[in-house]
């Protein structure tokens, strides 16, 4: 195989499997930083070895093995320099005898997720740590999701890693009796991963398919472990949103708003699966925020045309959702639904009230929504100002182009 082909294959494996491999190395090594070092060393070696020997039949297993041996070398060097610490040699022996299978590599991401969401960790560190280690989001991407400073996120992640190492927090999926109390954090992580994939906060594309696929895969794994209503609701929500992926952008990569999408391009199979999960979850009458959001998505999916959407039902569902989970972002979404039901002025009044409280001043979608309703009402100067503020806050290229187009239309 030519050098360029090998390098391309290594890059592909890194994109698709590096976080799975890292999760297994963290389980084997019990040390995030050592596992990260071993991972990168393994991929570095792969470029040379695969050019010489060919790409192995199972690249993931090969890379786990290579990473393990690199870690053993590091630990042996540490043991020589720290002869007074015999536990290092014991760690080397334990690592040399460690066994794993390719199935472990799949399951280890779920194990790592539960470890990162362990109740012994600070609540404000659990989700950022999981997004960083399990899903490879950067601290900047995580900070944007939490509307806070990257340095703050980085500090939380460092402290959480140290806590896992020092407290020897177990690397395992909890027992069935422990699962329910550990569920909320894990659901939140999967939801944030999907959201970052469904509407990437940065970059040249609207969607990051690697993240949406991974979130759905983890949701399905969680359903097998614990088929609770909120697990069903989250999986349904992701499937219903994913069903619209093909229609959300033009062939040129331009953003298409929901009301302008070609609904014949929506995935009927995903809609059917998601809708069935919503019905199943709601019949339990033990539903929460994910079930309610999935129910809203299902109402959208049921409408054959945008102007046939049951906005009254959607507003009603948002009313219930706000009682269950008060949130300014949910208020914003409800305001948009109210505008669809009662007119742009009704929605704009609600959005301006939210912005006056200051909670969404740095949230680009709030300013975009305000701009759109000002535009519809002929308040051109206000629309232009709001779109300009949204543009300042937007990093994703298709969203920026969409806003720039609106500004050009306004003159």
Question: Model-derived features: where do they sit?
Answer:
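Amphipathic, Lys/Arg- and hydrophobic-enriched alpha-helical face
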Residues: 13-32, 45-49, 114, 118, ...
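Arg/Lys-rich amphipathic alpha helix in sigma70-family domain 2
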Residues: 68-86
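Conserved RNAP core-binding helix
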Residues: 32-51, 57-64, 86, 135, ...
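Amphipathic alpha-helical interface segments
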Residues: 23-24, 28, 38-49, 62-74, ...
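Amphipathic helix-loop-helix modules that constitute alpha-helical solenoid scaffolds
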Residues: 78, 85-124, 130-141, 148-319
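Residue at a conserved register position within TPR or TPR-like alpha-solenoid repeats
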Residues: 239, 298-302, 338, 374, ...
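A short, charge-rich alpha-helical start-of-domain segment used by transcription regulators
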Residues: 2-23, 33, 180-188, 192
């Amino acid at each position: 195989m030519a050098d360029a082909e090998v390098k391309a294959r290594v890059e592909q494996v890194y994109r698709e499997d590096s976080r799975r491999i890292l999760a297994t190395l963290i389980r084997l090594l019990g040390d995030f930083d050592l596992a990260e070092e071993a991972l990168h060393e393994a991929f570095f070696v792969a470029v040379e070895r695969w050019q010489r020997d060919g790409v192995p039949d199972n690249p993931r297993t090969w890379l786990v093995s290579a990473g393990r041996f690199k870690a053993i070398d590091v630990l042996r060097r540490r043991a020589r320099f720290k002869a007074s610490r015999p536990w290092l040699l014991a760690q080397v022996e334990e690592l040399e005898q460690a066994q794993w299978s390719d199935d472990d590599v799949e399951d280890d991401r779920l194990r790592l997720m539960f470890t990162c969401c362990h109740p012994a960790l600070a609540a404000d560190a659990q989700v950022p740590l999981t997004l960083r280690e399990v899903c490879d989001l950067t601290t900047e991407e995580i900070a944007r999701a939490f509307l806070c400073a990257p340095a703050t996120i980085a500090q939380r992640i460092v402290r959480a890693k140290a806590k896992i190492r020092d407290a020897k927090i177990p690397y395992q999926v909890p027992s069935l009796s422990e699962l329910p109390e550990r569920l909320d954090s894990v659901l939140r992580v999967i939801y944030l991963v999907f959201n970052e994939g469904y509407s990437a906060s940065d970059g040249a594309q609207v969607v990051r398919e690697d993240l949406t696929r991974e979130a759905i895969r983890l949701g399905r794994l969680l359903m097998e472990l614990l088929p609770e209503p909120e697990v069903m609701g989250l999986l349904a929500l992701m499937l219903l949103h994913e069903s619209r992926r093909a229609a959300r952008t033009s062939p040129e990569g331009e953003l298409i708003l929901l009301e302008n999408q070609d609904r014949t391009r929506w995935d009927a199979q995903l809609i059917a699966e998601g809708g069935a999960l919503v019905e199943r979850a709601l019949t339990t009458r033990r539903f929460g925020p994910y079930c309610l959001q999935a129910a809203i998505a299902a109402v959208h999916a049921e409408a054959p045309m945008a102007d046939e959407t049951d906005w009254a039902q959607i507003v009603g569902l948002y009313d219930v959702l706000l009682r269950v989970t008060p949130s300014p972002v949910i208020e914003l979404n409800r305001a948009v639904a109210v505008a669809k039901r009662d007119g742009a002025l009704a929605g704009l009044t609600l959005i301006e009230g939210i912005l006056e409280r200051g909670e969404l001043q740095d949230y680009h979608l709030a300013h975009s929504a305000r701009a759109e309703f000002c535009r519809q009402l002929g308040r051109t100067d206000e629309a232009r100002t709001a779109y300009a503020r949204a543009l300042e806050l937007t990093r994703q290229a298709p969203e920026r182009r969409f806003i720039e187009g609106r500004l050009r239309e306004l003159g």
